Amino acid sequence: MDTIVIAGLGNPGSKYQWTRHNAGFLFLDRIAQLEGLSIVRKQFGGLTAEWERKGKRLVLLKPQTFMNLSGRSVMPALQFYKLKPDQLIVVHDEIDLALGAARLKQGGGHGGQNGLRSIMELLGKGDFVRLRLGIGRPPHGDVTNHVLGVFTPPEMEIFARVLDGALDMLETALDEGVPKAMSLFNNKSYLEG
């Protein structure tokens, strides 16, 4: 059975649960809710669950290392399952995408995202798929306060649609390949219901 690790990035603890930086955790929580899974197994310095879907074993991983050390959780998972970087999908917040947007990307740099930076440092490269969930830049002020800030209720309403759209995107990528999913979904906006 093919195995893919889907790492949703975020920070552990209730203090960070609804912050923009926890977009990856929120995405995995949405999958767990829809599929009747519990992401509670302690492995690889994180919490995991396995989702069997169409002949694939999908390991949902929420690193509990804090964002800046995400690679310390992702790398052991890849080693345990003997996987290559192209068998990894990282789901993360993206300040360079507006709230209401989600994009798939194959490879690339870290763009200042510290969780990606940590993973790339340990892998030695960035040849993995990223599912980028837009949180937008702050209109003015500190980026750190923005990413660690909690979604407002109107923002959360939009972000809930982003999560469902991103799940459609992920399922298409798994079933038909990343290029097909990118062509179908990368220009969609989830601002309106």
UniProtKB/Swiss-Prot annotation:
Coiled coil: none
Top-level enzyme category: hydrolase
Example GO molecular function: tRNA binding
UniProt subcellular location: Cytoplasm
Annotated positions for site Discriminates between blocked and unblocked aminoacyl-tRNA: 11
Keyword terms of this UniProt record: Cytoplasm, Hydrolase, RNA-binding, tRNA-binding
Signal peptide range in chain numbering: none
InterPro entries found in the cross-reference section: Pept_tRNA_hydro, Pept_tRNA_hydro_CS, Pept_tRNA_hydro_sf
Pfam families in the record: Pept_tRNA_hydro
Gene Ontology CC terms: cytoplasm
EC numbers, comma separated: 3.1.1.29
Domain of life the protein comes from: Bacteria
Catalysed transformations (reactions): an N-acyl-L-alpha-aminoacyl-tRNA + H2O = an N-acyl-L-amino acid + a tRNA + H(+)
Broad class of where this protein is predominantly found: cytoplasm
Annotated site (Stabilizes the basic form of H active site to accept a proton): 93
Biological processes, Gene Ontology terms: protein quality control for misfolded or incompletely synthesized proteins; rescue of stalled ribosome
Record-annotated active site: 21 (proton acceptor)
Ligand binding (tRNA): 16, 66, 68, 114
Entries under NCBIfam families matching the protein: pth (TIGR00447)
Subunit and partners: Monomer.
Protein family according to the UniProt entry: Belongs to the PTH family.
Functional summary from the UniProt entry: Hydrolyzes ribosome-free peptidyl-tRNAs (with 1 or more amino acids incorporated), which drop off the ribosome during protein synthesis, or as a result of ribosome stalling. Catalyzes the release of premature peptidyl moieties from peptidyl-tRNA molecules trapped in stalled 50S ribosomal subunits, and thus maintains levels of free tRNAs and 50S ribosomes.
Stated name of the protein: Peptidyl-tRNA hydrolase
